[in-house]
């Protein structure tokens, strides 16, 4: 992979260079010493992966991540001196589109890089995701639902760590997946379009922005795209609303899940992925109470085990699954649903 380094500390840059050099398949494309320079470099020479520090002069790592996802979306890994001490900034950057976060590597005795440091494992993981990027071709049309019937709806909520989890989930779904998918990811509207474009590159299904008045369609993935709440109306169409005003997250997973319970007339499946806090737990519980199947991501595969943990704690999940098993479960559930309707 071609990797861009964004860090203003020479010692940290050298540690990153030497760690990357342990993998002959990777090379340093450029080094930026602040966020503004990183944005310009990403536009002029798009890398496969950016290693982004958080605290830098001019533009910090969070703002740079936002700008990159707006102007030239690419994979971004937060690499900072102490992830734990900068947790709030890390979560903000992951909400802006960064895939994951890891501590800056240190050099061993004699200035050598340690191959066991977590950075290499993170780079390898992202490299595997990039290797599965789908060609830009029109996906096959999903098999039509029976006349007059709504397609199954898969409602997905995610927050910190969501971009990586969503990429891994979507790439496992076939191009003829006969369900509609709506995603509520905690992102600012400024870079939602970039995230949709990013996800589209790893999905056999088209990923688009959810538009006011649109209707979820089989074989299509829609992403909430404003700082208002996405919800279903009584007519089954999508709309955005400022209410409720007091929610800590915008868009809110809970608001969308509750609207599925109230207004979706067909089958539905709720999925709550990695994320900080509790958003989505009550909505997932409401979906399960209504009779819909619900899934929460497990702790071992969650970047931040907050939202799915809250859901599991209140019995909101029909199943708690590792990320790699969720797509297969969705395929199985949708197939069973179609067989019942024949």
Curated annotation (Swiss-Prot):
CDD domains according to UniProt: CheB_Rec, REC_CheB-like
Domain annotation Response regulatory: ranges: 2-119
SMART domains: REC (SM00448)
Subcellular location: Cytoplasm
Domain of life: Bacteria
Catalytic reactions on record: [protein]-L-glutamate 5-O-methyl ester + H2O = L-glutamyl-[protein] + methanol + H(+); L-glutaminyl-[protein] + H2O = L-glutamyl-[protein] + NH4(+)
EC code: 3.1.1.61, 3.5.1.44
GO molecular function, one term: protein-glutamate methylesterase activity
Domain notes: Contains a C-terminal catalytic domain, and an N-terminal region which modulates catalytic activity.
Stated name of the protein: Protein-glutamate methylesterase/protein-glutamine glutaminase 4
Organism: Burkholderia thailandensis (strain ATCC 700388 / DSM 13276 / CCUG 48851 / CIP 106301 / E264)
């Amino acid at each position: 992979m071609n990797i861009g380094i964004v860090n203003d500390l020479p010692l940290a840059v050298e540690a990153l260079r030497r760690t990357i050099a342990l993998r002959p398949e990777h090379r340093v494309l450029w080094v930026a010493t602040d966020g503004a320079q990183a944005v310009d470099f990403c536009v002029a020479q798009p890398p496969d992966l950016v290693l982004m520090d958080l605290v830098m002069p001019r533009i910090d790592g969070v703002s740079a991540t936002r700008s990159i996802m707006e102007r030239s979306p690419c994979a971004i890994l937060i690499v900072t001196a102490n992830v734990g001490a900068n947790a709030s900034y890390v979560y903000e950057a992951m909400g802006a589109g960064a895939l994951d976060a890891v501590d800056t590597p240190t050099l061993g005795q004699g200035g050598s890089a340690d191959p066991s440091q977590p950075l290499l494992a993170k780079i390898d993981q992202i490299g595997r995701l990039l290797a599965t990027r789908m060609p830009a071709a029109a996906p096959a049309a999903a098999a039509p639902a029976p006349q007059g019937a709504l397609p199954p709806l898969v409602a997905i909520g995610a927050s910190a760590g969501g971009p990586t989890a969503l990429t891994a989930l979507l790439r496992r779904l076939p191009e003829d997946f006969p369900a509609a998918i709506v995603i509520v990811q905690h992102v600012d509207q400024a870079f939602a379009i970039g995230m949709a474009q990013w996800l589209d590159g790893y999905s056999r299904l088209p990923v688009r922005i959810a538009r006011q008045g649109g209707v979820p369609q089989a074989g299509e993935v829609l992403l909430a795209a404003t700082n208002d709440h996405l919800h279903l109306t009584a007519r089954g169409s999508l709309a955005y609303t400022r209410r409720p005003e007091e929610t800590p997250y915008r868009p809110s997973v809970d608001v969308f899940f509750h609207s599925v319970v109230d207004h979706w007339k067909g089958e539905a499946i709720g999925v709550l992925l990695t994320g900080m806090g509790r958003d989505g737990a009550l909505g997932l519980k409401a979906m399960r109470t209504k009779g819909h199947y619900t899934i929460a991501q497990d702790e071992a595969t969650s970047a931040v085990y907050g939202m799915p943990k809250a859901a599991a704690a209140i019995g909101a999940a029909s199943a708690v699954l590792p990320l790699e098993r969720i797509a297969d479960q969705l395929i199985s559930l949708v197939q069973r649903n179609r067989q019942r309707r024949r």
